[in-house]
């Protein structure tokens, strides 16, 4: 019978200490083994040292605006569904940490630079500073006017830099106002509306009472909802304007029971409220017992902190540990922008920025977004293809595209504007 020490020696490849030799093998001198271990350790340490010396630093800038109304403390405290609850820098920093191992193997160190514009006029100086730092990857955490200004100025100022929109759902930025180097990780308004319409059609809740606010953003939401409703066979039984006001003469415009009581045909109440303040008062306050969707109740979102598949819990926990708050859709969009930069750097470590852009926008590079399939950017408008979660405050109850929704090429292109519908004419 083979002595236990010999079995251990065979498994570990280290000769046994003391006792009779195992089989016919000659014992290896201890000093020789010490020398081998010492050589291996030095080689390993030398490899780390070489990697550290040879690492190429790549900086990704996160550009935000001081005093951005989206981040007013009162708004963030209320945490309206579909609205940001913190700056994009948190998501990008987590992406750099998550990608460190593969980047290190490629000899790259990803550095995140936080750039806060004092006002819109500060963009020119910020771009000059970024040019001096040789930055060519930018994540934009900006309102629409400042994002458009950045997208127009960045190519010339930063040598063709790639700009990621990680926070705005404006369809125009993917359409007539698109740019060749502008990629979108946050889903478009049309994508969110299509996801919601797919779910309503699947549940056969086809008759919707629409409550629409007075803001320009509410009108844009209505445009997207009506487009999606026509696409998936939904019908608006009536559209009622709402208004939050202290004027006693207009009090009825903010009364949910009055707004929902006269229409008896609807199967669901769709709230189109880009601000979010009115929408939060609608669930469980309708005259008839009906589900509420849109800006409250059942909400279409790119991420939910209680997503339980595809590594979602691990991602949400890592983010919450670092940022001290739950991960929202805006945080996920910032994180996936950072991951996209890391992925293209690993796949094409020596490629110039123009080649990286082509590889991302309609090219072979795809990113793991912890939502199931690997995600890629559409060639025609730079939008990231992605599943959309249908969720409420306590979890995810559906994922679009839903089963049964078909597309001749890519089922995720059923969300938002397909190539034939796109008004974007800018290509890399």
Regions found by a protein language model. Give the residues of each.
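Bacterial N-terminal signal peptides that target proteins for export
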Residues: 6, 28-41
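N-terminal signal peptide c-region/cleavage motif recognized by signal peptidases
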Residues: 49-51
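Solvent-exposed, acidic/polar segments of extracytosolic/periplasmic ligand-binding ectodomains
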Residues: 58, 371-428
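Signal peptide-proximal N-terminal region
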Residues: 71-73, 79-114
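Extracellular/periplasmic ligand-binding modules, especially the Venus flytrap/periplasmic-binding
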Residues: 92, 308-366
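Short beta-strand elements in bilobed, periplasmic/extracellular small-molecule ligand-binding domains
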Residues: 102-119, 178-181, 230-250
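Short, well-structured alpha-helical segments in soluble
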Residues: 117-136, 251-264
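Extracytoplasmic ligand/sensor domains, especially the bilobed periplasmic-binding protein
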Residues: 132-239, 293-295, 304
């Amino acid at each position: 019978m083979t002595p236990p020490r010999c079995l251990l020696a065979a498994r570990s490849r280290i000769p046994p200490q003391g006792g009779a030799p195992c089989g016919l093998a000659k014992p290896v001198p201890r000093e020789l083994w010490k020398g081998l271990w010492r050589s291996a350790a030095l080689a390993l340490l030398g490899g780390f040292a070489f990697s550290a010396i040879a690492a190429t630093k790549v900086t990704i800038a996160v550009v935000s605006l001081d005093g951005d109304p989206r981040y007013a403390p009162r708004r963030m405290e209320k945490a309206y569904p579909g609205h940001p609850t913190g700056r994009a820098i948190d998501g990008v920093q987590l992406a750099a940490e998550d990608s460190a191992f593969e980047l290190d193997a490629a000899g790259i160190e990803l550095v995140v630079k936080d750039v806060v514009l004092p006002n819109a006029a500060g963009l020119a100086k910020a771009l000059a500073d970024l040019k001096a730092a040789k930055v060519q990857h930018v994540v934009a955490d900006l309102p629409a006017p400042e994002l458009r200004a950045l997208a127009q100025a960045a190519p010339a100022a930063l040598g063709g830099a790639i700009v990621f929109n990680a926070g705005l759902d404006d369809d125009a930025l993917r359409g007539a106002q698109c740019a060749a180097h502008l990629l979108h990780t946050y889903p478009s308004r049309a994508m969110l509306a299509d996801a919601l319409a797919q779910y309503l059609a699947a549940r056969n809740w086809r008759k919707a009472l629409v409550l629409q606010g007075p803001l320009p953003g509410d009108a844009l939401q209505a445009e997207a909802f009506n487009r999606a409703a026509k696409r998936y066979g939904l019908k608006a039984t009536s559209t009622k304007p709402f208004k939050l006001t202290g004027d006693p003469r207009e009090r009825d415009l903010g009364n949910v029971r009055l707004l929902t009581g006269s229409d008896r045909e609807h199967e669901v109440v769709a709230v189109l409220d880009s601000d979010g303040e009115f929408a939060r008062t609608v669930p469980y306050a309708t005259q008839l017992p009906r589900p509420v969707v849109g800006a409250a109740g059942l909400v279409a979102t790119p991420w939910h902190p209680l997503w339980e598949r595809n590594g979602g819990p691990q991602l949400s926990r890592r983010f919450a540990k670092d940022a001290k708050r739950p991960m929202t859709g805006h945080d996920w969009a910032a994180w996936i922008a950072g991951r996209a930069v890391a992925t293209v750097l690993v796949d094409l470590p020596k490629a110039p920025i123009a080649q990286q852009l082509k590889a991302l926008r309609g090219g072979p590079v795809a990113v793991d977004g912890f939502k199931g399939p690997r995600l890629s950017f559409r060639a025609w408008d730079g939008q990231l293809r992605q599943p959309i979660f249908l969720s409420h405050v306590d979890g995810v109850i559906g994922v679009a595209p839903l089963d049964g929704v078909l597309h001749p090429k890519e089922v995720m292109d059923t969300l938002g504007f397909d190539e034939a519908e796109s008004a974007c004419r800018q290509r890399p």
